[in-house]
Regions:
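S-adenosylmethionine-dependent methyltransferases
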Residues: 1-203
């Protein structure tokens, strides 16, 4: 076990395994995400820091879309007593989600579906939708607009998305700012390493 100590770390009260940890290496031999779920993306830490300071998710039902390894959702479950469902179109990410849920002693539900097919019926039992690094191609902008509109037509009360500030994200954010229901904030963290980005809050 001591040989593994440098292969994981604790940030914001959650345990995170590095890529070289034996458990992650084992998963990578068995499960290979085909899209972008092969790592923890930086904007997850922007979301987590925002949640720590503003606490909008406490005791809420949270939908973590495009979840990847699911750290933002796991943070919500562990530190804010949220009921979390992780959503991704690539089922190969879910073993990584479940591994991190287990080492953090939380329960996470998983749904395999894409942004285009996540229905209002599936979203109606949730209050908050979150996402990190989920708008990186221009053709995703309209897809996410449609998803967010469906979310508000169901029971979702707010949508919170973090991003480094990619052009597609800025297009999405500006659209919701222009409609009068969106707000963009610059955000940065110093740990686990320096990260700068933007957070879009829609409510």
């Amino acid at each position: 076990m001591s040989s593994e100590r440098h292969k994981y770390f604790i940030e914001y009260g959650i345990n995170v395994l590095r890529s070289r940890h034996s458990s992650i290496r084992k998963l990578k031999r068995l499960h290979r995400p085909s899209l972008h779920g092969f790592r923890v993306w930086p904007s997850s830490w922007l979301l987590i820091d925002y949640f720590k300071l503003s606490n909008p998710v406490r005791h809420s039902r949270v939908l973590d879309i495009g979840c990847g390894w699911g750290l933002a959702g796991i943070y919500c479950a562990k530190n804010h007593s949220s009921k979390v469902t992780c959503v991704d179109r690539d089922s190969e990410v879910f073993p990584y989600v479940q591994l991190h849920a287990e080492i953090n002693n939380v329960e996470i539900t998983a749904i395999k579906t894409g942004f285009e097919t996540l229905s209002g019926i599936e979203m109606k039992s949730y209050e908050i939708m979150i996402g990190a690094d989920i708008c990186f191609w221009v053709n995703m902008v309209d897809t996410l607009k449609s998803l967010i509109h469906r979310a508000f037509e169901s029971n979702i009360k707010s949508v919170i998305i973090a991003d480094p500030g990619r052009s597609p994200f800025e297009m999405l954010a500006q659209y919701f700012v222009n409609t009068g229901i969106g707000k963009i904030m610059n955000w940065n963290v110093t740990h686990p390493y320096p990260i700068q980005g933007r957070i879009l809050i829609i409510r």
